[in-house]
From Swiss-Prot:
Location relative to the cell: Secreted
Protein name: Neurotoxin Cex9
Native organism: Centruroides exilicauda (Bark scorpion)
Propeptide regions on this chain: 65-67
Gene Ontology CC annotations of this record: extracellular region
Keyword Disulfide bond (UniProt): yes
Tissue: Expressed by the venom gland.
Residues the record lists as Cysteine amide modifications: 64
Length: 67
């Protein structure tokens, strides 16, 4: 699947260099995520080819630190 991987807080992995981004690509390809490619889109790391089990934004009942 494709999407924004999330932190335990429910927030997207943030990034600042839009487009091709080494940090996002590395985050997406981490073994537990299984992604094939990652880049920075709307200041969040967007991943392609994630494992179905990888949590992606938005998470149900998690609003990125807001209550």
């Amino acid at each position: 699947k494709d999407g924004y991987p999330v932190e335990v807080t429910g927030c997207k992995k943030s990034c600042y260099k839009l487009g091709e981004n080494k940090f996002c690509n590395r985050e997406c390809k981490m073994k537990h995520r299984g992604g094939s490619y990652g880049y920075c889109y709307f200041f969040g790391c967007y991943c392609e080819g994630l494992a179905e089990s990888t949590p992606t934004w938005p998470l149900p009942n998690k609003s990125c630190g807001k209550k």
